[in-house]
Amino acid sequence: MKKAAVASMIVLAAVAVAGIIPGKTNRIAASPEENTGEEAAEENAQEKVEDPLLPEIDTSVKIEAGSRVAVVSKNTEGQFWDKVQAGMEDAVKAVNEAYGFSKEDAVTMTFEGPDDEREVETQINTLDAVIAENPAALCLSAGDMESCQAQLETATENGIPVVVFDSNVADTELVGAFRSTDNEKAGEMAAEKLSEALNGSGKIAVFSAQEKTASIQDRISGFQRKIAESDGIEVAEIIYQDGVEDMEAAMKEALEKHPDLAGVYCTNADISEMYLGLKKPEDSNIVMIGTDATDKQQKAVKDGAELGIVSQDPYAMGYITILTALDLTKEGVNVEKNSLLEPQWIDSTNMENPAYSNYIY
């Protein structure tokens, strides 16, 4: 079988996107090796390490020349989504190189969506337009897990295979594959780290993005399940952005309502950065855990304003999503239904370690 390598590091066998097992979830762990002292300093000065999660491209099965993959994301703004798009674009380049496609025969992709994931109607309108153009495959990150039913049915009726990435939809029977972070694990990780920091006791709040988004539901579910193991911790508030008119005002009100708040978990990058921007009392010692290691959160960790970050590998997610979409267009190729990437904990002890660079935005 002819294969073209796209990563210099050892490829984890679990990443392979061939071989469908309906209902089974494949979890992919990177397990970065810790480097300390002189070794870490030396590697930090070198070029960013390549992502070990990127699979090889199997060229033994034909892809139709000129295939176009349409991507409709729930958001197109922010460092996380920039990384997702970069991974997708690099996957397209790697496929064209591996198959030796000329410019005229090249596989292409489009990346569209709203600039705010709360703009669900904008995403639906974009989906309608994209499906009408009859792409070879559709990749979707759903801003509202219940909102895309009609569009998914239309795609199915027109023979357009669908890969959902990042945030799933309610009716998964209409989806060929799902590629995402293990968001329940992300929530569990946040709960575990927060409980450890508080010695298993104290009042906490959860400040969250949209409740109607599947990835957020999974993070909250994992967090609640894990935090319940700490009898001394009380969850005083869970506030969803789509449940209030002004999220910033709602967070301020929660802090005033609970002056004894000991900890906070923010479920995505936007909410994390919004919380960091709030004016707090000088003597505030609330332990904060955020999501997705953006520039602002990295600085907050270094400054001691944030304990740490549960972060994802958006580049790998984007890369694998495109390869999966193209696999769904191949005849006779079975594709794993569900494949989840492990999140990683980022704090002051590993932020400068190149082994974790794919989780730093």
Task: Report residues per predicted region.
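Hydrophobic alpha-helical segments within soluble ligand-binding/sensing domains
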Residues: 48-64, 123, 178-204, 247-248, ...
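Signal peptide-proximal N-terminal region
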Residues: 89-109, 229-231
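Flexible loop/hinge segments that line or gate small-molecule binding clefts
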Residues: 145-185, 203, 294-302, 306-307, ...
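Exported/periplasmic ABC-transporter solute-binding proteins
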Residues: 262-263, 269-272, 276-315, 321-342, ...
